[in-house]
A protein has these predicted regions:
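A contiguous loop/helix-start segment that scaffolds small-molecule binding in enzyme catalytic cores
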Residues: 11, 87, 166, 170-291
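Conserved helicase motor
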Residues: 66-72, 146-149
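Short glycine-cluster motifs
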Residues: 84-147
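Short active-site oxyanion
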Residues: 35-41, 115-118, 166-167
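A short, charged helix-loop
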Residues: 14, 140-162
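Glycine-rich, flexible N-terminal cofactor/catalytic loop recognition
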Residues: 1-67
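Alpha-helix capping/helix-boundary segments
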Residues: 47-49, 95-96, 125, 175, ...
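General beta-strand structural signal in soluble alpha/beta enzymes
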Residues: 43, 119-122, 169, 194
C-alpha cells in the first residue's frame, strides 16, 4: 500500500454510500443528497449507477468505475481527487459497499492521508437477511462468497463448525444447490434460511432444515437473483467425535451391510457429521478387505 501523498490545504471527503438492494424506495434522503452533490461517484458498475441516477432524477457530476478489476489502479487516483478538494462517493451495485466488494485499501489510504471518511448507512442484504431469518442474532459471522475449490471450502466448513455463531453466506444462483449439498454432508440436519431477491417483487424466503430448503429449489430449471443463506449457530465438536460404542456398531454393521447403508443408519441414529462417519466407515471397510 502506498504511503501518504502530498496534499493541498483543502481536502475533500470520502463517503461510503449504501444504495437499494432491490427497492428504490429504500434509498435514504441523506444518500440522495450526498450523491447529488458529490464531485465524483466511484461505482462498481457505472451502468448500474446511471440507472440509479435516472430513477432518482439526477445526473452525477462525474462518474468513474471502481471494482475488483481496477481497484489497485484507481485507489491512488481517487485519493488524489480528494486531496485536490473534491468529495468522492463510493457505491456498489446494491447495498453497502465493502461487504464482498472492493474498498478496504481505499479506506486505509484515506486514513493514512487524514481524509475524512463518512458512512451513509442504508440497505444491506447482510442485515436484512439476518433479521428475517428467524435465527439468533446475538452473534453472527459474515462468510460472504465461499471458495469454489473443494480444499478451501472444506477448510471454511471446518472453521464454521466450531464457531457457535449464526453465519451468513452469499452464493450465485448457479452454485447454490451444490453449496447446500456440501453443507448437508458436513453439517447434517441444521436449521437455516434461504433468501432470494430481498425487497423485490419476487422476494422469496424459505426457512427450515437444509434438506427441506434443498428439496424446494434443486429441481428448478432456473434460479434467479441475489441469494443469501443463513445458518443457525454451529458448535459441532460433538458431531466430529466418534465414541467407542459407535465404532463398534459400525464395525458390526459393515459385516453384512453396504457402506452406504451403514453410513445412513449411523447418521440417522446419532446425528453425527456424515463426512466423519463416512470416512471412518470407509477406513474400516478397507481393513475388512485386507483380512
Amino acid at each position: 500500500m502506498n504511503s501518504k501523498i502530498k496534499k493541498n490545504n483543502f481536502t475533500g471527503e470520502l463517503f461510503i454510500v449504501s444504495t437499494p438492494i432491490g427497492n428504490i424506495k429504500d434509498i435514504t434522503l441523506r444518500a440522495i443528497s450526498v450523491l447529488a452533490k458529490a464531485d465524483v461517484v466511484a461505482a462498481e458498475d457505472t451502468r448500474q449507477a446511471l440507472k440509479l441516477g435516472n430513477l432518482l432524477n439526477f445526473t452525477f457530476k462525474k462518474l468513474i468505475s471502481y471494482n475488483d478489476n481496477n481497484a489497485s489502479i484507481k485507489d491512488n487516483t481517487i485519493i488524489n481527487l480528494m486531496l485536490k478538494g473534491l468529495n468522492v462517493c463510493v457505491i456498489s451495485d446494491a447495498g453497502t459497499p465493502l461487504l464482498s466488494d472492493p474498498g478496504y485499501t481505499l479506506i486505509k489510504l484515506a486514513i493514512n492521508n487524514n481524509i475524512k471518511i463518512s458512512a451513509i448507512p442504508g440497505p444491506s442484504s447482510l442485515l436484512s437477511s439476518l433479521v428475517v431469518s428467524g435465527l439468533p442474532l446475538n452473534s453472527f459471522y459474515f462468510v460472504g462468497f465461499p471458495p469454489k475449490k473443494n480444499v478451501l471450502r472444506n477448510k471454511l466448513f471446518s472453521k464454521i463448525s466450531f464457531m457457535n455463531s449464526t453465519s451468513v453466506w452469499f452464493e450465485s444462483p448457479k452454485r447454490v444447490v451444490s453449496l447446500l449439498e456440501d453443507m448437508i454432508k458436513v453439517f447434517g440436519k441444521i436449521e437455516g434460511a434461504f433468501l432470494r431477491e430481498l425487497t423485490k417483487l419476487n422476494e422469496e424466503i424459505i426457512r427450515g432444515d437444509l434438506s427441506f430448503i434443498l428439496s424446494n429449489i434443486k429441481d428448478r430449471e432456473i434460479i434467479k437473483g441475489e441469494i443469501v443463506i443463513v445458518l443457525e449457530p454451529l458448535d459441532l465438536s460433538e458431531k466430529f467425535e466418534i465414541s467407542e460404542n459407535i465404532k463398534v456398531q459400525i464395525q458390526s454393521l459393515l459385516q453384512n451391510n453396504s457402506l452406504r447403508d451403514v453410513v445412513d443408519t449411523i447418521v440417522a441414529q446419532t446425528g453425527k457429521s456424515r463426512n466423519v462417519i463416512y470416512k471412518y466407515s470407509l477406513s474400516e471397510k478397507n481393513k475388512l478387505k485386507k483380512l
